Amino acid sequence: MELSYTTTMHYRDVVFYVTTDRNRAYFVCGGCVYSVGRPYASQPGEIAKFGLVVRGTGPDDRVVANYVRSELRQRGLQDVRPIGEDEVFLDSVCLLNPNVSSELDVINTNDVEVLDECLAEYCTSLRTSPGVLISGLRVRAQDRIIELFEHPTIVNVSSHFVYTPSPYVFALAQAHLPRLPSSLEALVSGLFDGIPAPRQPLDAHNPRTDVVITGRRAPRPIAGSGAGSGGAGAKRATVSEFVQVKHIDRVGPAGVSPAPPPNNTDSSSLVPGAQDSAPPGPTLRELWWVFYAADRALEEPRADSGLTREEVRAVRGFREQAWKLFGSAGAPRAFIGAALGLSPLQKLAVYYYIIHRERRLSPFPALVRLVGRYTQRHGLYVPRPDDPVLADAINGLFRDALAAGTTAEQLLMFDLLPPKDVPVGSDVQADSTALLRFIESQRLAVPGGVISPEHVAYLGAFLSVLYAGRGRMSAATHTARLTGVTSLVLAVGDVDRLSAFDRGAAGAASRTRAAGYLDVLLTVRLARSQHGQSV
């Protein structure tokens, strides 16, 4: 299920996602989404709630919902009245965590941490160690979409084991609320005073907001008086502005594909022979030749002997590029791939391989030819490719690039970020600016936003840690602490689970994105070094 928005704004420490007509704003709370409509003529706007509810262990029981209600009562949370008579929304489950006193404590969070062993067992059908994280949604910044999951993601906090949700416990639901929970009411007071109201046409019809249904089932409407309404109250009929729209995947040829087709050249296998009959493109065997012999072929004192003038110029050019980007073995330069235990020329080879594999222009074929000439001329024996070594090198650089781009995408979700003095070097600042501009230019379906100095500084903070070789998660944690955007840690955690060899459209899209990010960083670094601006 998807909810679309056009822009974001910070108001009272809450991230609000504002719709195109500026008459509705969403915010995230404990894995659920609350929707607040603009008030009209002293009448409050429609309030709605979307998200997963917990139900029971079978199709007709409500054991889990009743358990949560019972625990809430035992903990003295009588003012919390879950919506509906049968289901309990995920943000009410948050309140069973001893570290959470009200919905206010889980504002801006996409997930719920469950420490209750009994409840965790209900959700996973397995005895678990204490602490599972249940994710109910994600915000897709590149599409400006809030995606609510039909089935949650459940991960053990300690072991990172991913569980399969129990089949009957969770369901996606939609509810109309008479009011917000008392702890959240103050957060939206005066919200629309800072959002200009659109001019209504004379023949304006009742407004509608589309809810795109992407799963097999539409969210179940729940009628009730809950959300802390202060009493049972009489039930009454309401007319919602939300209209459910079923998404149907395109069948047959299309002018625009949602994702590039998978590149089978290297993603299907790490066995080099499997790519021999593939369409023209770099193979892992070619990468291994360069990986194994490039340092000798390009760095030896007599590496130029027997080469043509053009080849000698190419050898010197590759040596210079490797030094400008990655430094030397004894004095590495702060740049992407710093955590990889590779020589500068090996990093350069992997860098160009990833770019060239996505059919982008790169000098990788020339590098292969030069190394091939050297091995033939000197009779150098090249052993069979070491698949794990190649996979680690490719995935390391692939994930670094994807983490940098994903962080930029997450930061661009926010039109306003907290102003802080974040010192970054000129090289990193240039990389950050170029990457943000590239990502903003790819978002063709949405209005272009303004890249602020804060965007540049905070992405620069991420890149600085990454370039120092301290790891992607360290960089994400550091940036999350600076910005308060905790979703950075989860997003980079998702990147760490991706592979440059994943199959399908999603894998192909990730490889295309990573190659694009690497291409941008390469271009800006070499351009700055050519003009003597690198420090």
Swiss-Prot record:
A Pfam family recorded for this sequence: Herpes_UL21
Predominant location category: virion
This protein's UniProt keywords: Host cytoplasm, Host nucleus, Virion, Virion tegument
Cystine pairs: none
Transmembrane segments: none
Parts forming coiled coils: none
Compartment(s): Virion tegument; Host cytoplasm; Host nucleus
Keyword Phosphoprotein: no
Gene Ontology CC terms: host cell cytoplasm; host cell nucleus; viral tegument
Region of interest: Disordered: 251-279
Domain of life: Viruses
Tagged with keyword Hydrolase: no
Function (record text): May participate in DNA packaging/capsid maturation events. Promotes efficient incorporation of tegument proteins UL46, UL49, and US3 into virions. May also play a role in capsid transport to the trans-Golgi network (TGN).
Subunit and interaction comment: Interacts (via C-terminus) with UL16.
Family stated for the protein in its record: Belongs to the alphaherpesvirinae UL21 protein family.
Protein name: Tegument protein UL21
Origin species: Human herpesvirus 1 (strain HFEM)
